[in-house]
Amino acid sequence: MRAVDGHRYWGWPMWPEELREPTHAGVQAFEQAHAGLVEFHAWLQWLADEQLGEAQALGRELGLPIGLYGDYAVGVNPSGSETWSDQALYRKGAGVGAPPDALALKGQDWGIPPQDPHALIAASYRPFSNLVAANMRHFGALRLDHVMALFRQWWVPVGLGSIAGGYVHYPLDDLMSVLVLESERHG
């Protein structure tokens, strides 16, 4: 929508109702009506992926033993493609942040939607595995931003501030196993 109507629609929560659900017939109709634009943006994604792969290969050819070093973010944009395409995985009504401490007396709310650990388990960790694999694709090393998020995350109720938040625990052993598996797959 953004590419079609300029900045009128900043993310899927602001799209017309029939486009907010990926399986709605309106999405297929939009794809057909704007096939050239959809293909152009898919091509841009492909091109960026190709260039990242070439940069990794060049780094290795030039003697960098690891090549590119990537960064796996703690979360995703609440109006981005991840939350649109897998809405059941992300909890509405909460954000990820940090509890009150000496550096931030009221805590922090990063505005990042948390993944529901129960939904992650129900999906056999495929969303996490796929995201890790995609992030490892062109990197020789991958830094996990806030690695503690594999163990627990501070969830902040929307509109109530971080002080009203609490820790939600995640299945650390299972998530670490996925990381080990994907690390082995990617060398």
Task: Name these PLM-found stretches.
Residues H41-A73:
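Conserved, well-ordered alpha-helix/loop/beta-strand core segments that scaffold catalytic motifs
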Residues M1-D49, G75-G187:
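Alpha-amylase-like alpha-glycosidases and glucanotransferases acting on alpha-linked glucans and related
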